[in-house]
Amino acid sequence: MTWSAHDVAAELRRRLPGLGTKRLHKLLYYSQGHHLAAVGEPLFGESIGAWDMGPVVDALWVAEKRGVGGGSAAALDEAALNTIGYVLSRYGALSGDDLEAKTHREPPWRLADAVRRPGQSAPIHPQWMHDYFAGDIADVPPTGLVAVGGPDAEDTPDELRAWAARGA
């Protein structure tokens, strides 16, 4: 079952009172990625975009900027709660800046960033997240990507854009 990013955000905020916006969006990204890898379906239906500051759930960002909140942690099932618990145990102690830096080194954000225009967002495809979090992308060093037939650390931004445009 797929929930709303608002529901997942409500649970993250319940578990981490005072959770800031940047940190929230990175934890949503990690929750989505780990749920895709473990369960095989999205945790929430909204798309995630690559922004300058890392992954952001576009629709949630816009709604909250307009003062529209909502979401109910009570709607989530055991699998969703387990994913969130795992993500918090793994990433919950990191700051928003730490999470931003971490996401910028990971293939899903890098692939989307390679095709986005400065100051704009580009979608982070769920398949990229699934593959990365499931470990299908081998040896991801902090400085680059390594994947069979894919980009590597020496690729220029133009080469990354061309690779992503081929639908890889």
What annotation goes with each model-predicted range?
Residues M1-A168:
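Domain-edge interaction signal
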